[in-house]
Curated annotation (Swiss-Prot):
Keywords: ATP synthesis, CF(0), Chloroplast, Hydrogen ion transport, Ion transport, Lipid-binding, Membrane, Plastid, Thylakoid, Transmembrane, Transmembrane helix, Transport. Pfam families: ATP-synt_C (PF00137). The keyword Plastid applies. Belongs to the ATPase C chain family. It is a multi-pass membrane protein. This is ATP synthase subunit c, chloroplastic. F-type ATPases have 2 components, F(1) - the catalytic core - and F(0) - the membrane proton channel. F(1) has five subunits: alpha(3), beta(3), gamma(1), delta(1), epsilon(1). F(0) has four main subunits: a(1), b(1), b'(1) and c(10-14). The alpha and beta chains form an alternating ring which encloses part of the gamma chain. F(1) is attached to F(0) by a central stalk formed by the gamma and epsilon chains, while a peripheral stalk is formed by the delta, b and b' chains. F(1)F(0) ATP synthase produces ATP from ADP in the presence of a proton or sodium gradient. F-type ATPases consist of two structural domains, F(1) containing the extramembraneous catalytic core and F(0) containing the membrane proton channel, linked together by a central stalk and a peripheral stalk. During catalysis, ATP synthesis in the catalytic domain of F(1) is coupled via a rotary mechanism of the central stalk subunits to proton translocation. Key component of the F(0) channel; it plays a direct role in translocation across the membrane. A homomeric c-ring of between 10-14 subunits forms the central stalk rotor element with the F(1) delta and epsilon subunits. One of its GO terms (molecular function) is proton-transporting ATP synthase activity, rotational mechanism. The keyword tRNA processing does not apply. It comes from Ostreococcus tauri. GO terms for cellular component: chloroplast thylakoid membrane; proton-transporting ATP synthase complex; proton-transporting two-sector ATPase complex, proton-transporting domain.
Length: 82
């Protein structure tokens, strides 16, 4: 097993999960802040805003899970290691 391939796999896995979590994390914070602001402006629309927020948070979290899957594949099911 080539140590350079192993090192590149570890770095790639770290980048996959790190960069895969940074964007959705920022997006989730922004979405939650805007939802709180929307509920403060229109308290009667709380249910609709909350439902839309939860759906959008689930879609954003899926991106992080995809990054985790790529990282796990690079660590444990690496196609480059024979």
């Amino acid at each position: 097993m080539n140590p350079l391939i192993c090192a590149a796999s570890v770095v790639g896995a770290g980048l996959a999960i790190g960069l895969g979590a940074i964007g959705p994390g920022i997006g989730q914070g922004t979405a939650a802040g805007q939802a709180v602001e929307g509920i403060a402006r229109q308290p009667e629309a709380e249910g609709k805003i909350r439902g839309t927020l939860l759906l959008s948070l689930a879609f954003m979290e899926a991106l992080t899970i995809y990054g985790l899957v790529v990282a796990l594949a690079l660590m444990f099911a690496n196609p480059f290691v024979s």
